[in-house]
From Swiss-Prot:
Protein name as it appears in the record: Carboxypeptidase Z
Domain (FZ): residue spans on this chain: 35-157
Disulfide bonds: 40-106, 48-99, 90-126, 115-154, 119-143
Source organism of the structure: Gallus gallus
Main localization, broad class: secreted
Obligatory cofactor(s): Zn(2+)
Assembly behavior: Interacts with WNT4 vie its FZ domain.
Keyword annotations: Carboxypeptidase, Developmental protein, Disulfide bond, Extracellular matrix, Glycoprotein, Hydrolase, Metal-binding, Metalloprotease, Protease, Secreted, Signal, Wnt signaling pathway, Zinc
Residues annotated for Zn(2+) binding in this entry: 245, 248, 377
Keyword Repeat: no
One GO molecular-function entry: zinc ion binding
């Protein structure tokens, strides 16, 4: 009986004991444990002043006990910078949703949770935007943990935004299938939509990254074919590249829209689009320079000059950053029997500053047997073709043709003639200086420069590439994009169809085994192409009669006469069967001199998906963090490791 009475008295004493006094400084840090009942207080967080309510309560759902604690937290910093990180996508929606957790609504001294369905809908629409920048979904936006169902009396933190479309292309299901929004798209919006397109049409589309920019942004490609992700025998590979210069944004938006057209028209049964996708593997890289684009976008459409954002984050012009193989081609041109194709990258090139974007594209070119390509630029209305570097460097404007001059002119005209403005004969318009040339010009004859991507394509790979200046404004206003698209629509399709000109075939031995890297030569054209891994090849040729030779180490040489009629618009099939021959040992030791470059080729070891930006401190662990990690550099402790996907 006595022990029970003592326990009762002790309990009563503790119940009536005053709360411990706060030490100096503890109250402002939210560290006081008081018995005072929490009350509603006015919201004073600068990033949450536009919420639909006026009062909140501390501690919040994260047990942060004061305004000061919240403002110094990584969660609050995140919602404050989300607009910049996601380039405007899903904002202010995400910020308001975050505010509903960090500063929840308070009425009559009672906290009200935000609605779970609002969180779930926003996560569904915006998760891909986080994926695009390699960021995990924030833990404090866990829809099950910090949100409530409508039956529990929740509130909608996005009520005032109702009626607005939060995410591009997230439109009602009954919207017309042909609806397209013509606007400038941020990097995250672009990546999000590419992934959505591939997900919804996985039978004809897929996305992949060829590498990362200097600041860590993935260089995303969307591919269209009947077997996405795989090379198919005798099906040619085509690529479009946009936004090589960050401030030249029209090419990026054209490819963004072309992606939509390819999907819509294919599903609606359009014969032209279906024929293209069924017979071609198409790769669209909308933005090769996303870092530069960000800087240009900060200036704004219509206000951007000719410099801001043109270069990469390393201050490199990507169209001057490729190996100079053109000088080597000029040196070889006078040598009897010398080859002007598949010229190796010289060792001296790697001594300079090579952008990760450049390395990624070069490795991409090696991994896929591209046949035809175009790079979309802005600032003029003209189509240029190699060589871009003059035979005599001191002569800025000199006609400098490749051995495939006729074919390149045919390719350039295929785009120019299908473009209503480029083909317009009026000299009083943008691009009027090129009217007498039919809207096309040899690159070096316009102006000479070295290190260009088009010359590298031609001299290092099998691929033919032209450069298309798609408009006189580099960063036009959004209302101009609709007109620009309609001017370029048919030209884009017409040029893609040119990948089916010339001849194609398979080189094999007498047993039907494919022969890789066999050479296909055309008499009178000092430029060979080689067979792919499956022994298939594609040789772009204009109409005419040719003597075509196939040869490979250890096999006989086979020649065939080929005639391509003027009206022939499909590649002619020309197969070769090579017979083995005996090779003397001393001949096996002979190797072309240029093969010595293969002893040092950093491109083979280059990981295009590695992070490249150098961070403070220099430690390997810091350098591997994503580009957006620097936004949280002010936090000495409690850095948001929960935002790292690998954490």
């Amino acid at each position: 009986m006595v022990p029970s009475l003592l326990l009762l008295l002790t309990g009563l004493f503790r119940a009536t004991e005053p709360a411990p006094r706060c030490e100096t400084g503890q109250e402002t840090l939210g560290q006081c444990q008081t018995a005072q009942k929490a009350k509603c207080v006015d919201i004073s967080l600068s990033s949450c002043t536009d919420v639909t309510y006026t009062q909140t309560m501390y501690p919040n759902f994260l047990d942060q006990k004061s305004r000061e604690v919240i403002e110094y937290s990584s969660e609050y910093i995140l919602i404050s910078v989300l607009h910049n990180l996601l380039q405007g996508e899903c904002n202010p929606d995400l910020r308001l949703l975050g505010c509903s957790v960090l500063a929840p609504q308070c009425e009559k001294d009672k906290v009200i949770k935000p609605c779970r369905h609002v969180c779930e809908n926003l996560k569904k629409n915006c998760l891909s935007a986080f994926d695009a920048i390699d960021m995990a979904w924030p833990y404090f936006l866990d829809c099950d943990r910090f949100f409530a169902g409508e039956e529990e009396g929740c509130f909608d933190p996005l009520a005032k935004l109702r009626g607005e479309v939060a995410v591009e292309e997230d439109l009602p299901s009954d919207f017309p299938a042909t609806f397209i929004q013509f606007k400038h798209h941020s990097y995250s919006q672009m990546v999000s939509t590419l992934k959505k397109t591939a997900s919804r049409c996985s039978h004809i589309a897929t996305t992949y990254s060829i590498g990362r920019s200097f600041e860590g942004k993935d260089l995303f490609v969307i591919e269209f074919s009947t077997k996405p992700g795989h090379h198919e025998l005798l099906k040619p590979e085509f690529k479009y590249i946009g936004n090589m210069h960050g401030n030249e944004v029209v090419g990026k938006e054209l490819l963004y829209t072309l992606r939509s057209i390819c999907v819509q028209k294919y599903l609606l049964g359009n014969p032209r689009i279906q024929t293209l996708i069924n017979n071609t593997r198409i790769h669209l890289l909308p933005s090769l320079n996303p870092d530069g684009y960000e800087r240009a976008a900060e200036e704004g459409a219509g206000y951007n000059g000719w410099v801001i954002g043109r270069q990469t984050a390393q201050n490199l012009d990507l169209n001057r950053n490729f190996p100079d193989l053109t000088s080597e081609a000029y040196r070889r041109a006078g040598i009897r029997g010398a080859r002007l194709d598949h010229i190796p990258i010289p060792q001296s090139y790697w001594w300079g500053k090579v952008a990760p974007e450049t390395k990624a594209v070069m490795k991409w070119m090696r991994s896929i047997p591209f046949v035809l390509s175009a790079s979309l630029h802005g600032g003029e209305l003209v189509v240029t073709y190699p060589y871009d570097y003059s035979r005599h460097p001191m002569e800025e404007k000199e006609f400098s043709p490749t051995p495939d001059e006729k074919m390149f002119k045919m390719l350039a005209k295929a785009y120019a003639d299908a473009h209503p403005v480029i083909s317009d004969r009026s000299e009083h318009r943008c691009g009027g200086n090129f009217v007498k040339r039919g809207g096309i010009i040899n690159g070096a004859e316009w102006y000479s420069f070295t290190g260009g991507m088009a010359d590298f394509n031609y001299l290092h790979t099998n691929c033919f590439e032209v450069t298309v200046e798609v408009g006189c404004e580099k960063f036009p206003l959004e209302e101009e994009l609709f007109t620009i698209w309609h001017e370029n629509r048919d030209a884009l399709l017409n040029y893609m169809e040119m990948v089916h000109r010339g001849i194609k075939g398979i080189v094999s031995d007498k047993f039907g085994n494919p022969i890789k890297n066999a050479r296909i030569s055309v008499r009178g054209i000092q430029h060979d192409i080689t067979t792919a891994a499956d022994g298939d090849y594609w040789r772009l040729l204009p109409p005419g009669t040719y003597i075509v030779t196939a040869q490979a180490m250890g096999y006989t040489k086979v020649m065939k006469r080929v005639t391509l009629p003027i009206k022939m618009k499909r590649a002619g099939r020309v197969d070769f069967v090579l017979r083995p021959i005996e090779i003397w040992p001393n001949k096996l030791l002979r190797r072309p001199m240029e093969d010595m470059y293969d002893q040092y080729d950093p491109l083979e070891l280059f990981d295009p998906h590695a992070q490249h930006a150098q961070a403070r401190g220099g430690s390997q662990q810091v350098r591997e963090k994503p580009w957006w990690w620097s936004y949280f550099s002010s936090l000495d402790l409690h850095k948001p490791l929960w935002l790292l996907k690998q954490h």
